[in-house]
Amino acid sequence: RMMAQMLNECYLAMGFKSRFITCMPKVMINDCHVINAVYSNTLNKWLWMDPTFNAYVTDEKGNLLGIGEVRERLRNNQPVVLNEDANWNNKNKQTKEYYLDYYMAKNLYYVTCPLQSEYNAETNYPGKKWPMYISLVPEGYSSNGKPGATAYDSHNDSYFWQSPYQE
């Protein structure tokens, strides 16, 4: 979580629209994974960036993919390609089969993030309100929110992944 929050704040400091995304399994058994979505003005979409695994994902033609696109491609058994130098904390090289097909497929049942991407989003100090969250969940599923936080669920991929420049 910390690495994704730090990368998010680096992206924000450089002027990029970014947010950290908590990727959740259907049943939480002490495991989830937090990655980043950074908005590309050139590609007009959010891109997958994972600081823990030094990972990004492309399609079979080398086009960068976003979290929603990877999720959909895994669901539909379409090709996804993990960058060749992906590794866990600069120690263990990762394979597409483990990282995407097993680990992330399990953790992409639903995704959640703060409504506002900002510095110190989850830093707790006197007088600071805990952020509101939005989750992209499958039909018929409820994220149940984060304890002590206001949370909203959406089933609409287009809404969740819309451009940060939309009015």
Give short role names for the model-derived ranges.
Residues 1-34:
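Active-site neighborhood of thiol-dependent amide/isopeptide-bond enzymes
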